[in-house]
């Protein structure tokens, strides 16, 4: 089914699949691809937090926005050098309930964009506070843009599905 925006609900199982597929994409790059140079500085398998962001996160919360694509962000503690913040990795989420976007050539499902950030201001073992610190206090276009839409935690597992931000409103679930 080709449709610009899927209105299918996003479930906890979908969030888990998005996390699993996205971390696998990063592991592929950072452990056996061109990103191997970061392996000594960053444990890609242990982010401070991972989150579904932007339009799909809005749809998870409000059930109205629809899903054009999925944006999954990983946040790591800064360690000597920043991770490549301009890189975007992609993979094909082929869950049939979401269909495919007609303009995304080469995808049989919805495109997933995977992004990473290394951040200096964070709170260990508190992903909600870490995300609030990033969204409210980092002076970056990424933080501002994410805060204007929505952020739903994917990791750590104990926080899966927690909405921490929706249209510049911050929640402490």
Language-model regions: role of each:
Residues 88-145, 151-153:
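Conserved catalytic core of two-metal-ion nucleotidyltransferases
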Residues 42, 77, 93-95, 138, ...:
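Short, isolated positions within intrinsically disordered regulatory regions of eukaryotic proteins
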Residues 78-90:
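Short, conserved charged micro-motifs
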Residues 42-46, 107, 159:
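Short, solvent-exposed loop/turn segments that connect beta-strands within catalytic domains
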Residues 31-70, 75-80:
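Active-site nucleotide-donor binding segment shared across nucleotidyl transfer reactions
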Residues 28, 39, 50-52, 71-74, ...:
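Generic low-polarity alpha-helical segments
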Residues 1-36, 64-65, 81-84, 140-149, ...:
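N-terminal regions immediately upstream of nucleotidyltransferase
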Residues 25-28, 43-51, 87-92:
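Short linear motifs at secondary-structure transitions and domain/linker junctions
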């Amino acid at each position: 089914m080709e449709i610009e925006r899927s209105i299918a609900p996003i479930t906890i199982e979908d969030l888990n699949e998005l996390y699993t597929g996205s971390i696998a994409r990063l592991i592929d790059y950072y452990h056996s691809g061109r990103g191997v140079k970061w392996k000594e500085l960053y444990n890609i398998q242990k982010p401070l937090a991972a989150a579904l962001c932007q339009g799909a996160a809005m749809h998870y919360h409000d059930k109205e926005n629809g899903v054009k694509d999925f944006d999954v962000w990983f946040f790591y503690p800064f360690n000597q050098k920043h991770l490549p913040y301009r890189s975007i990795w992609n993979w094909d989420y082929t869950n049939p309930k979401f269909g495919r976007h007609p303009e995304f050539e080469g995808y049989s499902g919805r495109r997933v964009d995977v992004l990473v950030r290394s951040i200096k201001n964070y709170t260990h073992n508190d992903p909600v506070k870490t995300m609030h610190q990033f969204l409210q206090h980092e002076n970056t276009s990424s933080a501002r843009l994410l805060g204007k839409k929505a952020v739903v935690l994917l990791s750590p597992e104990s926080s899966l599905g927690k909405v921490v931000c929706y249209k510049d409103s911050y929640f402490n679930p």
